[in-house]
């Protein structure tokens, strides 16, 4: 989406085709170029110009010679037109001179280059017509750039109404991200390329006949099929008798004949790794490696390659595109516009009552007569009965069309019952259309898009019933009637509209994809049309099919390999790079664009998300109100509450009916603390040994208190419950926020983001306090009034939102309370409620014992009693794992795993019923599960209890698995016939691994995530089934019976298809041997058979649907295409291409989009706004952030400091990174003992090792050993370097294969350190690692599901005969091989062929009636359900969950300097400042150091004390309040900064927002109190200073009062103090106090704070006070009690104030003093002599 470069004179001299309808100039001589039709003509000609390029090939001219002159004529006309345009542009703009000259404009240069290419092509064609240049010569490659002229036709649509800088920034950012991910992909390709070279090397050893001689290797010399082997006897495959294992390269075969795939050197290895990572052909490489090398090595390499490269790294591309598209969506909303209404008719609607009394939403003018039909017909047409009748007829038509099938060659097809039915339906729908036109009028009818579609179907089907057009391409109109059935389901209709949204987005993407295919096909056509022995690019249709095949990834390796073999060894690398780049763009970026568009369509508008959040919260509250149906059933029975029963009571007394639950309020609740009241009272007489009265009295008092408390709790419960619940919620939210502690950052700007957000908060506070009185001052202008009004409205909206949040919280609490009350009422009124099996009592000892056993779990977590935060212990991760489930569940997990391991040893030849050792695990599992279920049933009940065992699907599955295992163990059938009930029981027994889903909570969460999105997945499945049904019906009507052919390619007619013929055998797919003169390929004689293709046919809808389902998975569609083209006609190849395009580009990406959307919805991110999602990403990102493990620079400038500067210099780090890469290049060839190249390579590696030893030594010297050890990266480098030193020693000592292998491993380990040295690689590697961590349980779930299918596959297909893909590598003979086959199916590698091999039926196999293990037949129905269900669940759903997790985690790391929140630079700056303050590198600092940390921050985190002094105090006080003056961690300060850097109103959600605002309000109030207190002190000091200068009488009275008081307290010693002594006393007093200024909290001072006085720097010029003015002289013996001294000082001050107030003639001053006195008295704190500036200025 590039916008062209605008010149500075665009307005004066715009250029043609540079914008919609722009004009160049008003000059008459170039007036023609300004015409709009000229613009359109030039764009049309740009498209037409591609046509001659596509026809200009030697093969096309050979078949159609006149086309040579047609292309020449077209090129000549286009050449003159574009040349004239170019001259006109040059005339207007100038060629070189001027700011907007021709050569200075990019698009003008592009247009000129296209004209030059057009001239070159025309001259070349003249030479070809004159036979001067051969048509098959490479000169034709000069036409390669010509197809790019199509850009001229579409660049007009790349013009957007957005600022150019914004578009540039978006494209630059997305380009950087794609480049970064490409580097990340290249890193993994290089890594696996190096590993492949060192682990495998060459695959050149094959089994050949014993008499094979060098230079004489032919097809008949190889084994059938061609088999790789190992020359080592202990590993790999050993050739059968009559063959020997030989290196074909030594026998004379060239590299081109051996094939280009392999691990010979690093280049070929990377090429092979990329092929394997595309999941195309990788399994055959693995089989070759298994035959040539140890089995474990092949499995490890290829399975990890698929997992990391194909599933994780490549999916990061999807994440990049989705994130970029989400950002672009907001910017380009203006271009795409908002979604229009579903109908294009009237937008104004109203409710209308229909005939049945219901209400319908119809257009306002629907009742107005629009056509000429009578009113009764119009009413009938609008009725729902007519609508449903038409839809039912469409349904019948679809069923009839789907019932069509092939009836044989001799059956007359033209006028059968299906044709007659089609005529009848066509007439019916024609009448429907005519009726609607009559009722609505043609204008009213055609105005609806739905009616346009119906009219198109009517016209097409009417033509279709014409006999000559029946079973032609017009059949599309008949089968498209099924699309009308979408109107039946409003949910499906809404989903379709939501998915496809405005057609502009998806339509533009489809047009872009088609244009890309045409351009790339034309380029490839001109690049390879002259290559001999290559028929894939001889004509444009063949080139288009080849490039489309690469786009779908099916067989793209075959296309590339054939081209590589044809172009030769010299050009092969360039051709391979060309195809890989095209494949990379088409499969990763282009398909990701489709996923991004669908996700964008599923995305809600921002203004609806918060409303949806509120509605969802309300819905959750409503659902929590109701009890489950299994408990509500008790409400149907009459109430029978339990009454109090007294066993020993005289019959004369009648006991009133008192509920037992009421009495338990007073009795049962105290049983754990004291004895029962009725037992204690009579026991007092007997317990009077030592003190007969005291125990009794104390016990009675205790009981009385308990009774009072219980009664009080009952009475006060309703009053306090709600307030307590709200407080608990707020505390829980605050605690959760404290524990989560992580958040975000961003680039430097002129103003700090902390300051910006602080002022936003202050504005809201002022609005909050000013909203009560709406007084307007007279001097305000109109603009100010308007602004104030908007602010007030905004505040009222926020206030209303607060009230909604609080209402929802109250509703949730009330729902929970109501649910509890309902449970309590049922428990009280129904004796059998909450009684397991209606037998065991609720509080029975046995049940309590079972509860203790069932719920016992490990819990070693310690919580802080103050904050409630969980303290992390040393092994907290291990403790968390142990406490994940209960002890009983741990036992059952272990037993289940052991039982599954035992099942893995079962096979058709080692069955559990005949192997006693395998029965042990079976008995153990059933016994343990019996004990477990009995304990859980006795503890929690079976079904009718609140916590029953069967309360969800997991409980049902547990009981089902247990019953199946128990029945099988009791039965243990000895003979199991195929397709019998016993075999079905064995298949159901294979569901045993699913027990772990129920036992592990995280696994249950995975299942919930899968099934919660079942509705959307079901709707997508319906859409794909509809698409398949449309194309299947079409295929049956066109291809039924036409795909059958004789297996002898020389026979055309069916009558001649008899006898036998010799068929060639395919020996190898990899070797490219040529037949020698007189040589024949291996083959054998077979009978001729007229039959359909083996894997598919279109004889009925069922087979057609199965074939299209396989094609939908993009497997096998190339064979379907080739068969249809070869047997029906080339024109019908369009059919399969259209279906594959719709299925691949839209159908499969629908699954990806829906699964990602459902995952986001389950994670709670689907309804988050952009700001809220960024905030969640920020919190997750900061959780991972850690302090820099970098020691400080040495203080002096000595040797260590210089070494530190050297090791931290960027040049040093880059040099080390280059050295690591250079050492990795040494592994470009395999290190083999026998290869002479290995010795110099290993010697160079030794030199590199010593360099890295020097690097580690320098770092240890610079940082000190302790500082060096702080960094994990340094530890890893030290480990690898140590291993390198050990290898050097062993290498020179032993010099064998093991030392070479160790040296290669050390280099590979060193290669991993590149990620830590590159920021982008580190970020993306973190994405993959975190994705692996978060998807651990999804991966485990996939494996468990795969294990279940593997066990079932062994039972169903363990003895199936070998076929095309079932062979010695891929079969179900054991669980291990079945797992390998299923992992191959997960990647989609020929899964359909394996399924057809498992469907083999007699007479192609040998059945057995008694045992399934004695037959080699398959199971048709079983294979169909088995493979299709497995592929859908794993490939379409589970793998897409991995994509969703990667997308989520990539957005977590998707941060650049344009982010509105904290960026990586901000975070890095904070880490550096933290290291400066945390000098001990402990990760925590004292609270008083936070203010120094905040003062050191710069950039966007800077706090300017001149402007934001109050913000600074708020931040300091927040740390002190949350941590009580203790130590704060790195994440605590980062959390506080992140909260202060965002707009909490936009970023935070409901409960978190309430808790945060409550905290900030509290902080504001406390800091305001402190500020007022300091301000008052300062004012009083100034008042006293003025009083000292003006009132000398006051001084004399004060001195006399001092003398009287001193005489009263200490008569003997009265001395007069001097000013000099005053200063000394102040200093002494100051020295006696601790320096608590830095640690002083901003709360109200307490008695423990010893107030001090010190000389203020700001008051140096003021009169100095004397001690007698403020404080009584101290006594000879100091007062030890602090409280008395405080009271004395306080009393002295109040006395002096009273004197001042009496003598002061000003009444305001006196009232001020009295108010201050009262305020001080209320505070009860010590007043210090410090001013407010002392606390504000740190």
UniProtKB/Swiss-Prot annotation:
This protein is called Sodium leak channel NALCN
Q: How does it sit in the membrane?
A: Multi-pass membrane protein
Compositional bias (Low complexity): 1633-1648
* Protein family membership: Belongs to the NALCN family.
Membrane-spanning ranges: 37-57, 66-90, 107-129, 138-158, 174-199, 295-322, 383-403, 417-439, 448-468, 473-492, 503-530, 570-599, 887-906, 916-939, 948-972, 981-1003, 1016-1039, 1130-1159, 1211-1227, 1237-1260, 1272-1293, 1297-1318, 1332-1357, 1421-1447
Subcellular localization is given as: Cell membrane
Compositional bias annotation for Polar residues: 1613-1631
Q: What are the UniProt keywords, alphabetically?
A: Cell membrane, Coiled coil, Disulfide bond, Glycoprotein, Ion channel, Ion transport, Membrane, Phosphoprotein, Repeat, Sodium, Sodium channel, Sodium transport, Transmembrane, Transmembrane helix, Transport, Voltage-gated channel
Physiological role: Voltage-gated ion channel responsible for the resting Na(+) permeability that controls neuronal excitability. NALCN channel functions as a multi-protein complex, which consists at least of NALCN, NALF1, UNC79 and UNC80. NALCN is the voltage-sensing, pore-forming subunit of the NALCN channel complex. NALCN channel complex is constitutively active and conducts monovalent cations but is blocked by physiological concentrations of extracellular divalent cations.
Top-level division of the source organism's lineage: Eukaryota
The record lists glycosylation at: 210, 216, 1064
Q: Does the keyword Magnesium apply?
A: no
The gene for this chain is: Nalcn
State the residue spans of region: Disordered.
762-789, 1611-1679
Q: Where is the signal peptide?
A: none
Q: Which GO terms describe its molecular function?
A: leak channel activity; monoatomic cation channel activity; voltage-gated sodium channel activity
Which Pfam families does this one have?
Answer: Ion_trans
Q: Which residues form a coiled coil?
A: 795-830
Free-text note regarding domains:
Contains 24 transmembrane helices (TM) that form four homologous functional repeats connected by intracellular linkers. Each of the four internal repeats contains five hydrophobic transmembrane segments (S1, S2, S3, S5, S6) and one positively charged transmembrane segment (S4). S4 segments represent the voltage-sensor. S4 transmembrane segments lack some of the charged residues (K and R) found at every third position in the S4s of the NaV, CaV, and KV channels.
Q: Which organism is it from?
A: Rattus norvegicus
A single Gene Ontology CC term: plasma membrane
